[in-house]
């Protein structure tokens, strides 16, 4: 990945220099469209690298990420803080009313200009250098946060050695847990914090103590006294985001983020959330009451429903009320069936054939 990423950076730098050094007056084609088409190789490589880092990472990829991410952050800053490049973008933007652009071109121009502004192009002097420093720092912090979360998730394992501990679990989940244990030369059944293991266990396992153990492990990730603790990292991320937002003239990071979203501001978000809260609360309270009643019928009137009980008893209630069990649906969503459905639909709608 590293040679390809470095080559991608080199290619995009050459493409950006070509835009800047173009002797012709800045226009949509030679500036906005040319900028949009730059960095094709880098985009392709970083997309693959990012997906692999998220879905199938290892120590080598994580070490490479620590090296590559600051380079990518620096490269991004070198583009958006390039005064000559922004001058050309701004020149085109300022004459947008006279360019007779179609809707797609107008949107592209608007996005390009706003992206430069949102990434510090209007900053000057010390403020510009401070923005560069803060964004580089934020890139490192967010990468560390993600890596800690991933490592903490990967290192946890709940190994069960007694068959009775598996009561309630579908056979396919039991088999998968046995395979996980076997892959590490262990006897028994290993359950992890990864969704394919965690979610079914919380939904079907009869053993409440084990549900609690797994739930607490999942919900206290990166808070323990070890090298993966993210508490201080989160504080630093929040503070750095606040500094970036205020440097760019916003009240806080929420305002900075929401400007380009449908909600536009924090007040709209809170208004919607409060409307939803008011609308959903009666239904949520009724559902909670039903789940609690079902649990108490099984466990006694003194039973108190806890977070690690919710998935288990709400699934039981769903099965009881609607006779729907997710395990009944599993054969319909087996990988090959899903592939047939998705690819078949693409062929039917768009005439695209996958082989």
Task: Indicate where each model-derived feature is located.
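Membrane-interfacial helix termini and the short, flexible loops that connect transmembrane helices
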Residues: 20-24, 52-57, 205, 214, ...
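Active-site-adjacent "gating/activation" loops or surface patches in catalytic cores
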Residues: 183-221, 310, 322
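Active-site-proximal, well-structured secondary-structure segments within enzyme catalytic domains
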Residues: 108, 132, 137-140, 147, ...
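N-terminal helix-rich structural modules
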Residues: 2-169, 175
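Membrane-entry segments of alpha-helical transmembrane domains in multi-pass membrane proteins
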Residues: 2, 27-33, 226-230, 269-276, ...
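Short, contiguous, well-ordered secondary-structure segments
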Residues: 213-235, 240, 270-271, 277-278, ...
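Second-shell loop/turn segments in exported
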Residues: 2, 116-117, 197-204, 222-227, ...
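A conserved hydrophobic secondary-structure block that centers on an alpha-helix together
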Residues: 111, 120-134, 221-256, 264
């Amino acid at each position: 990945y590293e040679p390809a990423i470095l080559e991608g950076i080199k290619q995009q730098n050459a493409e950006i220099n070509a835009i800047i050094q173009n002797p012709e007056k800045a226009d949509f084609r030679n500036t906005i469209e040319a900028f949009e088409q730059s960095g094709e190789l880098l985009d392709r490589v970083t997309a693959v690298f990012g997906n692999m880092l998220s879905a199938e990472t290892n120590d080598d990829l994580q070490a490479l990420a620590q090296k590559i991410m600051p380079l990518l952050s620096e490269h991004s800053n070198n583009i958006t803080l390039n005064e000559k490049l922004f001058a050309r973008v701004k020149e085109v933007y300022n004459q947008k009313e006279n360019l007779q652009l179609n809707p797609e071109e107008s949107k592209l121009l608007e996005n390009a200009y706003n992206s430069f502004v949102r990434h510090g192009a209007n900053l000057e002097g010390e403020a510009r250098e401070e923005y560069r420093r803060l964004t580089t720092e934020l890139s490192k912090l967010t990468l560390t946060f993600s890596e800690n979360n991933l490592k903490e998730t990967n290192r946890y394992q709940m190994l069960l050695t007694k068959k009775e501990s598996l009561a309630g679990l579908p056979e396919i989940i039991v088999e998968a847990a046995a395979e996980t244990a076997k892959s590490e030369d262990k006897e028994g059944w290993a359950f992890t914090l990864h969704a394919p293991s965690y979610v079914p266990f919380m939904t079907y396992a009869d053993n409440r103590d084990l549900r609690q153990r797994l739930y607490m492990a999942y919900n206290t990730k990166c808070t323990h006294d070890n090298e993966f603790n993210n508490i201080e990292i989160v504080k630093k991320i929040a503070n750095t985001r606040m500094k970036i937002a205020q440097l760019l003239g916003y009240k806080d990071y929420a305002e900075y983020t929401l400007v380009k979203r449908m909600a536009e501001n924090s007040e709209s978000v809170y208004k919607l959330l409060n409307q939803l809260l008011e609308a959903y609360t009666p239904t949520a309270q009724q559902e909670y009451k039903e789940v609690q009643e079902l649990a108490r019928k099984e466990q006694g009137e003194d039973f108190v429903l806890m977070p690690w009980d919710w998935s288990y008893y709400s699934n039981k209630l769903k099965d009881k009320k609607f006779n729907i069990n997710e395990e009944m649906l599993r054969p319909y969503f087996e990988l090959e069936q899903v592939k047939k459905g998705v690819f078949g639909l693409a062929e039917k709608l768009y005439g695209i054939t996958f082989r």
